[in-house]
Amino acid sequence: MTYIYEAATTKYDDDKLLLRKAMGKIQNLCKISDGYILEEPVSKFGWTFFQMLMKTNFHLAIEEEFSDMIKKSKGSKPQEKFTDFLLSYLENDGCKIKLKLIEYS
């Protein structure tokens, strides 16, 4: 599955670095490189928004590596549990970014 998230932050430069650091860590744990793409940001009303595309192989590797943690995450649907896990993972690494799943296929 390919997941596309809309990310939002009020501290784009700081959170972008923290996001890249956290995603780099999770890629290393999953033995994946180039598992996601960040689109160009758009700023509105003090917030900066951008899309993050998570490639299928990265998503599947995360599900395999962290299956127990994902199962315990909030949500009734698998994609909700995955998103909650990812938000918790980022937050634990100091990244205060907000993620909203906008498409998965």
Q: What is each residue range found by the language model?
A:
Residues K31-S76:
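Short, intrinsically disordered low-complexity segments
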Residues M1-I4, F45-F49, N92-G94:
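A general secondary-structure signal for short beta-strands and their flanking turns/coil
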Residues I97-S105:
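Short acidic DE-rich linear segments
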Residues Q27-Y36, L90-C95:
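Short secondary-structure junctions
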